[in-house]
Amino acid sequence: MFSSILTKVFGSRNDRTLKKLNKITEQVNQLEAQYEALSDEQLKAKTGEFQKRLQDGEDTDNLLPEAFAVVREASKRVFSMRHFDVQMLGGQVLHTGQIAEMRTGEGKTLTSTLPAYLNALSGKGVHVITVNDYLASRDAEGSRPLFEFLGLSVGCNIPGMNHAQKKEAYAADITYGTNNEFGFDYLRDNMAFSPGDRVQRELHYAIIDEVDSILIDEARTPLIISGQAEDSSELYRKINAIIPQLEQQEKEDEEGKNGDGDYTIDEKGKQVHLTEKGQIHVEEILKTSGILGEDESLFAAANISLLHHVNAALRAHKLFSRDVDYIVKGDDVVIVDEHTGRTMEGRRWSEGLHQAVEAKEGVNIQNENQTLASITFQNYFRLYDKLAGMTGTADTEAFEFQSIYGLDTVVIPTNKPMVRKDKADLIYLTAQEKYEAIVEDIKDCVKRGQPTLVGTVSIENSELISNILKKAKIPHKVLNAKFHEQEADIVAQAGKPGAVTIATNMAGRGTDIVLGGNWQVAVDGINDPKPGTVEKIKEQWQKDHDAVIEAGGLHIIGTERHESRRIDNQLRGRSGRQGDAGSSRFYLSLDDALMRIFASEKMGNMMKRLGMERGEAIEHPWVTRAIENAQRKVEGRNFDMRKQLLEFDDVANDQRKVIYEQRNELLDEGDIYSTIEAIRIDVVDSIISQYIPPQSLSEMWNVSGLEEHFKSEFLLDIPLQKWIDEDDKLYEEKIRERILEEVNNAYKAKEDIVGPDVLRQFEKAVMLQNLDSHWKEHLAAMDHLRQGIHLRGYAQKNPKQEYKRESFELFTEMLEALKVEVVTVLSKVQVKAESDVEAVEEQRRQADEQPKQYEHETASATQAPEQAPEAAPAARPGNALRDGPKVGRNDPCPCGSGLKYKQCHGKLS
């Protein structure tokens, strides 16, 4: 109560922010008349003037009013469009590195031109990031005339571009592109083998369109570049045949995994688990089919991959549905993005899930992949010096934006008042009754000439409603991932009188539905349109527009609630743009996934007790509150999962930064001799310590072992025993110096053969190749560690702390192994001429040209499965290696003193 009184007196934080921004908007408005009087040349010259002032040390904040006024005036001349004051507010929010919530139709694309121009003046580049290729190309081409008028270059970064095109796109002052492509380019740059192979500049400033979709919906799906691993397609087919023989356990008992069924399904967590009976049953089937030996156990360390295949097949059959999570296109399984409803061509699920789905659908099974590089959107976008975003629905997720990205959300007022009518939800007992009511609503709209957009949560549901409408003989269009090529045409005409459009979440986000249809699209479809034809099209559009307004504007029908209130608001937001008339209503049933999983059984029992007749709907605030509570539960759970993923990925991210930083330093350095020399000294010293422990007696030295090691690993004959025999005062420190001198002399001899330049080039190639190889193996080890880390909780240990500790140990071991590998390769290789260096480069190029997959790891794969692969025990460096049989603690000491080993030299060890 006290806080509400304070808000009334002082205004909300949002009100206070807007008040400050309005003062700057006034300054921009005061400059309008002055800039209107400038000629085109004088207006264009302002860009050079601003750049000079920035170079002289002036701050971009000081330039803001003038720069915004210049963009507004240029837009009036190039597009005949003037930025509204609310767009000026949005532009300021974006410039200050915050999120601007702007309703649909308020001109977010035009708003972004303001901060993009201002921040591009520094010459460091601005990235404008959208959710798909179509919007990236459209916005780049749409904004190009404005920016080029002002003397700035525009690039577009989309998939399929060659290296030169990408380089050119990133060199532009303002680069448009998709979030996926920017992320993958970052990973590819950090796999490059020469500085010229990299395409991205430093990450300076990014404006993210539909920021909620990218930073929240896709936050749990890491970007992964992977290479092909071994072929195990036949095993996937065999395991796939087992799944139909298993039965689901309907209800878990108190113990959780005992009962009559073979597996349980957790719809909330999107997980499937074998019961104890199921584990025994699967083992029996595997033995009968000859996959598992009679005396073998499914849970033996050697068979852990079999269990992995069984779990993947179970998930493929029981959790992933055709036309909901994926579609089958020819001989390929194509993922459907759960948040946008779009297909994700070329993307594959990780951990064998994609292969399991391919086996289930009977299509060609592609090889498994091994991760070469990965990053989450959360960590990629936090690399930018300044980050901003815009969307129509951010306020419900404001806490997450602030806590994870440090981004405040500012709600920008609409240019015209919102007049859309959001009607109360109607809840039915069954899905069939719900669909019957939806059809009646659509019929009523068609009769009155009101356009209707029907929103569904999956391709399957969109096709189900389409079939119902076909039976009712109602003409309609379907917009889902199967027909995404027609998206622009369908959305353009979705506002025509009586038009019915069924759409998944993709719903043409980024494209406005114009009431009466889009006359510009109709004109563009005519070859060489005559002025008279264009006028007729405009006249017809005006009649249609007026008729639609009279009928009530665009009517939105939601066929079920989404997991997030924000997605519901996005659907509603398709209607009521720029003060247009419109309405919306959601139709629900107790069969809907959200109601079934999260709404309590009490609601269903209450509705049944009310004695509701067939086809009768309930409208009650109590029910609406229960639905909103269910959505809040899901939002809270999803936030916790994203936060947990970030906490785990932050550990890997710190390591990724170290590796990529070292890698880039290697690429940029012409001569890495000093680095190689330091590594060589370190490795040689470590090897000597294994055989001649520091500060040890000569009786503890393993001389023959050390000689053999250098012979096998360095191809170097070191007569250590001879040195010792010749000099009885040859102490450990002197031995180290002489061995290192021998190693250095041998290396110098190689340099004399080929010359220093060739050897430096060879050193860099070997270093990069081994760094990438060890990093790849380290990523696999980290994946295995994360899958099983939850088991540490059973030992009363904190899984996150254990993950940090063990991942650090893995990282340290990886760096040590890398050093040894590099020194060993350089010592063993017989370099004869420059052609040897070219051979290594050619080998590297061939490896680099191997087909790679660009994947989104499935969100559910980020949760730890029940059984984690066992890690192979790692050899611990630094232990002295024995020469000869092991000496027991109570055996006579081999030095000949007559004492027991534990009382003599055993004390020292």
Curated annotation (Swiss-Prot):
Q: Which residues does the annotation say bind Zn(2+)?
A: C893, C895, C904, H905
List locations, semicolon-separated: Cell inner membrane; Cytoplasm
Q: Where does ATP bind?
A: Q87, G105, E106, G107, K108, T109, D512
- What is one GO cellular-component annotation here? plasma membrane
Q: Where is this region: Disordered?
A: 246-265, 834-899
Where mainly found?
Answer: membrane
Please give the cofactor(s) recorded in the UniProt entry for this protein: Zn(2+)
CDD domains xrefs: DEXDc_SecA, SF2_C_secA
Keyword annotations:
ATP-binding, Cell inner membrane, Cell membrane, Cytoplasm, Membrane, Metal-binding, Nucleotide-binding, Protein transport, Translocase, Translocation, Transport, Zinc
Q: Where is the composition biased (Low complexity)?
A: 859-875
Query: Where in the chain are disulfide-linked cysteines found?
Result: none
Segments of skewed composition (Basic and acidic residues): 254-265, 834-858
| Record field: catalytic activity | ATP + H2O + cellular proteinSide 1 = ADP + phosphate + cellular proteinSide 2
In the record, biological process GO terms are: intracellular protein transmembrane transport; protein import; protein targeting; protein transport by the Sec complex
Q: Which SMART domains does this chain map to?
A: SecA_DEAD, SecA_PP_bind
Gene3D superfamilies named among the record's database cross-references: Helical scaffold and wing domains of SecA (1.10.3060.10), P-loop containing nucleotide triphosphate hydrolases (3.40.50.300), SecA, preprotein cross-linking domain (3.90.1440.10)
Q: What are its E.C. numbers?
A: 7.4.2.8
Pfam families noted in UniProt: P-loop_SecA, SEC-C, SecA_DEAD, SecA_PP_bind, SecA_SW
PANTHER family reported for this sequence: CHLOROPLAST PROTEIN-TRANSPORTING ATPASE, SECA INNER MEMBRANE COMPONENT OF SEC PROTEIN SECRETION SYSTEM
Q: Give the family, as the similarity comment puts it.
A: Belongs to the SecA family.
Function in brief = Part of the Sec protein translocase complex. Interacts with the SecYEG preprotein conducting channel. Has a central role in coupling the hydrolysis of ATP to the transfer of proteins into and across the cell membrane, serving both as a receptor for the preprotein-SecB complex and as an ATP-driven molecular motor driving the stepwise translocation of polypeptide chains across the membrane.
Spell out the protein name for this chain: Protein translocase subunit SecA
